[in-house]
């Protein structure tokens, strides 16, 4: 039997980063993962990481010469469905190899005193005499006692889905709750792709990769990989991309649904993809998850002081900080985007043209949005159906933001808050509800 203060299930970006923060708080931390160290997170290779995140999360900036580093770029374009209107956003981005970036994070965790065990799969929770979570058992038969168990296992959410507690939702992340990501690594015939360009209507993009004469053509879609391929076909038939030769494909998944209303209960916390913490406009998860982890480390350390047990009351501040901050903004954005995509290509072009929902960094918010939309309907440039969809989504978005900003400061008021939140999200719907051609 092993004894630790904290055991984390999952050694990818969320679990490894959080383990380092906890170890720096003088906690004894073990991270387990079902994969071998050599095969960890090798499903996807290239990823993009916003450069301001290095300083925000106190990570040493990757640079030329580092094994994980590929290149930098500093402009992201987005284009309308009919390819008529371009928006420009200035974002400094690093292109990197994900497995090697995680290796870099793991090195820092080891230096901080974290212990890793690979090729170990979660089997079940163990409980103390007061029926409180008190560690885990692995499928190899290993017993690990720990006062706090953290689920960082990704979409399978192997620990969270086994918990029966009023402060923890145990839903499974199903086909309607995630984006299936299809990535084509291509060799370009003539042109070069040095910046990222996305077409939000198709949930498609073309972006830099590790080969200078190559690119990544990608799409994300709910329901299935087969439907993602159908969306890729539609994307490539609708948008004139540079001529290319396909080198190989990668596939993966990212959560795309609202996160649990609570991330903690007695002796337990959920983070990363297991908590559905991704950016609503592009599905990226690394910085979104770390925003939750960063303040949580000190709260956990305080709860574990003097051999204490981390009750839901002691961990509750983790919920409050996140849900009133990034949680409120992402929830509102997610609800708004459901309405913004539920329209035709022509409607999407109109929104781009008038800087409604989609705008460049140097464009101001359209001060006459309602007037512009109504005029568009009258002139048959924008459909009445799209107006109703967008207006309804904006109203629902504002209600959800307001509700999250009123997140309860203690577990005592959670049940009432959750009940209203469930009603608001039922009215908002999901991105998968908008699919009509599956």
What are these regions (language model features)?
Residues 11, 111-242, 276:
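Predominantly flavin-linked oxidoreductase catalytic cores and closely associated redox partners
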